[in-house]
Amino acid sequence: MLYKHLWSLLLSFGLILTAALLLTGAAGPKTNAAGEIPPVPDPIPDNAVIFFEDINYAGHWFMYYTDRDNNDLRSIYVETNPNVNWNDRISSLKVGKNACVTFWKDILYHGSKGSYAANGTSVMAVPSLVGPGWNDKISSLKTRARDNCAKS
């Protein structure tokens, strides 16, 4: 009887965790057998934005497809870096050719606002957010199709 109850609790926890991961909309890399982070998709999907922990597209990363919102980047779970939230951690990004991203300095879409949009024919690569003043300062974001950037 006790085992049945424990199994039920574990199953419930697993379903809740799975639902939470799906609701964030984040797709992160999984480590390979050697514990290394796999390469970033190349080419990146036309309708996606990839965010990197370090400049020059290095370190851990996660990918959002268009029409995803995250009002608090502390809520993203990336399997290879589970103990680190992404609030104030993004240092470079790549925007798929049919995508755009709008981001804010504070959670809940408050504070200073910035954005990047690809031109429809090629990926927009931003190797460093240091110069634009956004390095490790993004706390919430929205991704959209390039044609809907103004609606962010």
Regions found by a protein language model. Give the residues of each.
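Compact beta-sheet-dominated domain cores in extracellular/mature segments
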Residues: 2, 27-152
